[in-house]
Amino acid sequence: MPSRSKRVLLYSHDSFGLGHVSRCRTIANAIVGADHSVSVLIVSGSPVVGSYEFRSGVDFVRIPGVVKQISGEYDSANLRTNIEHTLEMRTRIIRDTADIYRPDLFIVDKEPLGLRGEVGPALHLLKERGTPLVLGLRDVMDDPTQLAKEWERKNVVPALRDLYDEIWVYGLPQINKPLTGIEVPPSVRHKMVYTGYLRRELPLHTDVPHEGEEMQGPYILVTPGGGGDGEDLVDWVLSAYEHDGNIPYGAVIVFGPFMSATAREAFKERAAKFPNIRTLTFTNNLGVLMQRAAGVVAMGGYNTFCEILSFDKKAIIVPRTRPRLEQFIRARAARNVGLIEMLDADRGRDPQAMATALRQLPQQGIPSDVVVPGLLDGLGSVWRLVSKQLAHPHRGPASLEVPDAPEAAAEDPDATSPSRART
């Protein structure tokens, strides 16, 4: 029987914002870029997953979408069905996809059991087949007290102990340890590997959004990520320009696809009064705008933080603190290391405070001024971890097809190895 190419399945948690699908897309593109014989299939309910550019060898299964309200409650995104019915459909599609696709490796992003446990049946199916199971975590999850309560409610620790073979943390322990303060057995901590942050690169051929081309001089990129909770950030920046006429740079504001139409229109009217401010709702070429920018003002989600590091940009981070402290913890840690500056909106959104920060941006340092070994080694580390898993045959019942003979993965001799956690 002929051999088949290796297959990776990625589950992308998708209930709020762009972060999860963007991270999975970056990882998928890196995997197939490192080995053209590998295929990667992403399972996601993100409404914008089809807007991203994927390399040959990557495809996605779009499951019915859900949205997470600011209150923390979930609802169906588009279907006129209750959330329980939507989750039942998602659960079956995820399991059936895993069953038919027969991956050689399953990587779950962020949520160990998926949204409301929807990945559980697929995990158990693949575990019985001996498929390696990996949980990918961002550098910061949440305040330890809140995360501990959430994981206890979701019964996460048994899954970490009994189902997953490895836990990859897409960050560095010297910046943050996501499970600090969480009671997990030593066997779980032994599974943790710190990869470094995931470097972002621009495609070889990419168009510059015309809003960026229209700028006559240096500009600040303002990005609240998906935009669903970014209105306060955009309002604060516009208030600074309205308050202070001496800000040295113009601005390109990307609202994000999930910002309400009412808020976008109100912001557009305010921005139109300034000849050096441009606005747009969404672009899948945000990296191009960031590369050309003199600096960045952002909320500091994981992916935006990786882009700031990758393009070596001066940045002012205004983290949200509700419903999670993730962005605040990341921004505080990065500021303490010297990678970025931070403004705390909970202390009041004084227009003068933002204006002062924007005026001081030209004198601010760039991330590369600080030497952090292995800071952006994430993608290389992930590929070495993936290739290691793919090199081993399934440990359980054989699949319907015979897997390829293991191939040695080409490694960069100068690359930093992933860091395995011991604490």
Where are these regions (language model features)?
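Donor-nucleotide binding loops and adjacent catalytic segments primarily
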Residues: 28, 199-295, 347
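A donor-sugar binding/catalytic signature common to diverse glycosyltransferases
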Residues: 285-329
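Conserved nucleotide-sugar phosphate-binding/catalytic loop shared by glycosyltransferases and other
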Residues: 5-7, 12, 30-85, 89, ...
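Short N-terminal targeting/anchoring amphipathic segment
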Residues: 94-116
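C-terminal amphipathic helix plus adjacent low-complexity
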Residues: 352-423
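A short, glycine/small-residue-rich beta-strand->loop->alpha-helix junction that serves as a flexible
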Residues: 12-25, 48-49, 230-232
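A nucleotide-sugar donor-handling region in carbohydrate enzymes
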Residues: 137-232, 258-261
